[in-house]
């Protein structure tokens, strides 16, 4: 018997780093709404009473950055200085400049399919058949707990909840299959008046119990709810926030490797983002086809060069055909050039604000979550599954 524990964490939409991600992607969406060919790299820094946005943009779009930022913060729920941050009164500093002409020349080509990558980099994609969404269970349920935290807060079911929160969940695996949940952790910001006992009871009854499958819960499952006690000071007052600091929460919860590039605030010419979406699409279709139970793909690019430099695949011994044949199928069925990624997944639409919370993967309405190539891959493999 090979038993082990695996843990993933998530954070709420009101976590400072996630506020920053949402602001960056809100600005990106506003620009893409007016100018689909825009080049955008928008970073956000947030701290008590202040938001600073910076980066590089090449676009003719005219947007009201201050209004976008204030509305985003209001949507998240920071509307009162008692929460440590107020959308209506925070200072906003804008230091966005033009993109370098040298980079622009390297990307823009007469034939868009010859468009080079916006930077060098390594990118990973992953899928597993351990859940219906082809995502690892630990990050899936860590995200679900945070989605539920937001829901009960905004519906006033637990009126003392505040926007900042974190979750962490540890699964028990036996022979690579889930057999239970070992530990659940939730820390949630709250108002002054709630006592710790009522807080823990409310979070258990309204957030944890409705989300976690009973088949994985036992009398040995451990729960830590606000384990340090009071959590009144949170959000940007408790910690500064920065775009791109939650890359493991954004992806696979540590179950797969990560190339290091973040997503939010970047237009799809940046392969850090577009190739990560594409490789999720490729890996998910391989697993959905039955050609592997788990699939991790690495790709690399050079700045200004259209074709990928390398492709590597790892199937953890679960493949039904050789990894070499799988790579051939990838080349035959997916265009992984930067412009090819954009066309394949229709990435010029203003869809990115929603990706900035609760993970970029598993939301089935996004194009990189389609499994429309699964049957093609299975038929092309030459084997019956």
Curated annotation (Swiss-Prot):
Mg(2+) binds at residue 17. Keywords: ATP-binding, Cytoplasm, Magnesium, Metal-binding, Nucleotide-binding, One-carbon metabolism, Potassium, Transferase. It catalyses: L-methionine + ATP + H2O = S-adenosyl-L-methionine + phosphate + diphosphate. Its main location: cytoplasm. Its cofactor is Mg(2+); K(+). SUPFAM superfamilies: S-adenosylmethionine synthetase (SSF55973). Binds 2 divalent ions per subunit. This is S-adenosylmethionine synthase. Residues 99-109 are annotated as: Flexible loop. GO terms for molecular function: ATP binding; magnesium ion binding; methionine adenosyltransferase activity. Homotetramer; dimer of dimers. Belongs to the AdoMet synthase family. It is found in: Cytoplasm. Its EC number is 2.5.1.6. It comes from the Bacteria. ATP binds at residues 15, 164-166, 230-231, 239, 245-246, 262, 266. NCBIfam families: metK. Catalyzes the formation of S-adenosylmethionine (AdoMet) from methionine and ATP. The overall synthetic reaction is composed of two sequential steps, AdoMet formation and the subsequent tripolyphosphate hydrolysis which occurs prior to release of AdoMet from the enzyme. L-methionine binds at residues 56, 99, 239, 270. GO terms for cellular component: cytoplasm. The gene is metK.
């Amino acid at each position: 018997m090979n038993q082990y524990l695996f843990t993933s964490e998530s954070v709420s939409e009101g976590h400072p780093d996630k506020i920053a991600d949402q602001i960056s992607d809100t600005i990106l969406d506003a620009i893409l709404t007016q100018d689909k060919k825009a080049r955008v790299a928008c970073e956000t820094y947030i701290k008590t009473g202040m938001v600073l946005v910076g980066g590089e943009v090449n676009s003719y779009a005219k947007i009201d950055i201050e209004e976008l930022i204030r509305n985003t913060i209001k949507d998240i729920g920071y509307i009162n200085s008692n929460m440590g941050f107020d959308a209506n009164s925070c200072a906003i500093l804008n230091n966005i400049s033009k993109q370098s002409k040298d980079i622009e020349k390297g990307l823009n080509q007469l034939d868009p399919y010859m468009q080079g990558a916006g930077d060098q980099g390594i990118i990973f994609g992953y899928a597993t058949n351990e859940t219906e969404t082809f995502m690892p269970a630990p990050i899936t349920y860590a995200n679900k707990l945070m989605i539920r935290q937001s829901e009960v807060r905004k519906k006033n079911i637990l009126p003392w909840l505040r926007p900042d929160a974190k979750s962490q969940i540890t699964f028990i695996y036996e022979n690579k299959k889930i057999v239970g949940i070992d530990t659940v952790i939730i820390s949630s910001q709250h108002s002054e008046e709630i006592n710790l006992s009522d807080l823990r009871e409310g979070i258990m009854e309204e957030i944890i119990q409705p989300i976690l499958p009973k088949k994985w819960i036992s009398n040995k499952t451990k729960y830590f709810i606000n384990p340090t006690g009071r959590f009144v000071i949170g959000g940007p007052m408790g910690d500064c926030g920065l775009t791109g600091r939650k890359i493991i929460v954004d992806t696979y919860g540590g179950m797969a490797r990560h190339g290091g590039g973040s997503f939010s605030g970047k237009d799809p010419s940046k392969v850090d983002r577009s190739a990560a979406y594409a490789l999720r699409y490729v890996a998910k279709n391989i697993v959905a086809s039955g050609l592997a139970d788990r699939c991790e793909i690495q790709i690399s690019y050079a700045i200004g060069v259209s074709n990928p430099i390398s492709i590597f695949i790892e199937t953890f011994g679960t493949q039904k055909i050789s990894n070499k044949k799988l790579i051939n199928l990838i080349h035959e069925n997916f265009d992984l050039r930067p412009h090819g990624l954009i066309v394949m997944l229709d990435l010029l639409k203003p869809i990115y604000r929603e990706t900035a919370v609760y993970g970029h993967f598993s939301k089935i309405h996004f194009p990189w979550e389609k499994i429309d190539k699964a049957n093609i891959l299975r038929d092309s493999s030459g084997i019956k599954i």
